[in-house]
Amino acid sequence: MLKRDFLKTSLLTVVGAVLSPAVLAAAHEEKLLREARATPMADGPFTLPALPYPNNALEPHIDARTMEIHHDAHHKTYVSKLNEAVTGKPEEKMSLAQLLASASKQPDAIRNNAGGHWNHSFFWQLMAPKGGGQPAGALAAAITKDFGSFDKFKEEFTKAATGRFGSGWAWLIHDPKAGKLAITSTPNQDNPLMDIAGIQRGTPILGLDVWEHAYYLKYQNKRPDYVAAFWNVVNWSEAGKRYDASLKG
C-alpha cells in the first residue's frame, strides 16, 4: 500500500471512530449534564428527589455515568421545566397527581414535564442495588394468576419494553376496575395515571424507561440487552408495597 493511501485510510478510520453514534451520543449526554449543573433549578412547587442509592449502586447492570446523567440532567430538567410551566397559573397549586389526572386538559409543557417528573421519581424507587429475583406475597400470587407464571409475565413485559416504538415506557399496572394486573406501554412521558385517550389506565406497579438516554451509553442501540439487565435490579419489595396499597384503594 502506498504511504499516501495508508495515511488516508488511517485518517478515515480515526474520523469514523470519533464520529461514531456512540461517541456522539456520549458527547451529547455530557453536554446536557454540564448545562444542567450550570443552570439553577427554576423556582416552583416541585423539587428533584435524591436518588435512593449512589450512582454506581446498580453496576454492572446500569452504569454509574448513565445514572448520573439520567438523574442530574434529564430528571432535573423535567422538574425545572414543570416549575416554569405552572408558575403564575392555577396549576401551580395542583399536586403532581392532579396534573396527571387532568393531563388531557393540560398544555404539552405541563403534560410532558409532569409525566417526566413522576415517571422518573417512580423509576428510581423501583430499582435497588440488591434487586432482581422474583416477587413474593400477594404480588407473586397475582402475577401467577393473571399471567400464568412469573416467566410468562417476564416475557410479556419484555415484549412491551422492546416493542415500544421510539421513546416511552413499559408498565405493569393494577387495574382496580378489572381486579387484575396488566402490562402496557406508553409513548414519550405519558403514564397510566393520565386521562389520555388510548392509554390503559391503572396503578403503576413496575415501570421501565426505554428512552435511549436510559441505556445508550452502555448498551448503544441494543435495547433488548438493557431490558434483560433491568431484571437484575428490580426492587420487588417496593413493587409489592405498591400492589398492596393499590388493593386497599
Ranges and model annotations:
Residues 159-162, 167-220, 228-234:
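An amphipathic alpha-helical core segment
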Residues 61, 72-73, 83-93, 98-174, ...:
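All-alpha RGS (Regulator of G-protein Signaling) helical domain and cognate RGS-like helical scaffolds
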Residues 222-249:
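N-terminal targeting pre-sequences for secretion and organelle import
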Residues 48, 75, 117, 172, ...:
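Divalent metal-coordination and catalytic microenvironments
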Residues 1-14:
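N-terminal secretory signal peptides and thylakoid transit peptides that target proteins
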Residues 22-58:
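C-terminal segment of N-terminal export signals and the immediately downstream linker at the start
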Residues 16-20:
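Hydrophobic h-region of N-terminal signal peptides that target proteins for export
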Residues 45-77:
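Mature N-terminal segment immediately following signal peptide/propeptide cleavage
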